[in-house]
């Protein structure tokens, strides 16, 4: 990987750009397979983000990431159903997850993204991911068709 002054920073197998849930998930799963992963996130966590409502199917991914014990120990609100309300106030009947799929996964969480995203990023670190916060990826460097590194901007602007 390279910074603005094309100087080699490190050898790695995989670079992941973005440390939100998708980036943290991808980097953790790759690291679990034994690859050396560098993750770059332009923001410093925790940071505000929209999108708090999880669905039951996230259980299986959280299980693969070894996140279930952390989620169970968290103070996030447990979610057992959904109900929809239209703009005119009309409400649907509640949809209880357990009625559709009687399994432990039928309970999920309503998360605070700033806290959840930090938990996910720290979990990636626990699995060996070298996560860099406050670092912007400016460009992906190629040698022909092969990506060979990234050009980054450090928090101090370098």
Predicted regions mapped to residue ranges:
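Short glycine-rich hinge loops at helix-strand junctions in the catalytic core
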Residues: 34, 66, 128
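N-terminal FAD cofactor-binding segment of flavoenzymes
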Residues: 47-89
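Glycine-rich FAD pyrophosphate-binding loop
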Residues: 15, 31-50
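Short, basic and Ser/Thr-rich N-terminal targeting/leader segments
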Residues: 10, 77-80, 133, 146
């Amino acid at each position: 990987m390279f910074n603005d002054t094309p100087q080699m920073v490190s050898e790695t197998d995989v670079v992941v750009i973005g440390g939100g849930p998708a980036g943290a998930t991808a980097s953790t799963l790759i690291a679990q397979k034994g690859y050396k992963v560098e993750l770059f996130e332009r923001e410093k966590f925790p940071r505000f983000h929209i999108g708090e409502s999880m669905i039951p199917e996230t259980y299986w991914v959280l299980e693969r990431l070894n996140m279930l014990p952390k989620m169970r120990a968290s103070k996030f609100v447990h979610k057992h159903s959904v109900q929809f309300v239209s703009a005119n106030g009309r409400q649907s009947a509640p949809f209880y997850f357990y009625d559709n799929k009687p399994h432990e996964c039928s309970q999920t969480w309503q998360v605070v993204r700033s806290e959840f995203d930090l938990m996910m990023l720290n979990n990636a670190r626990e699995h060996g991911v070298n996560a860099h916060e406050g670092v912007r990826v400016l460009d992906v460097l190629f040698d022909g068709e092969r990506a060979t590194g990234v050009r980054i901007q450090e928090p101090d602007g370098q």
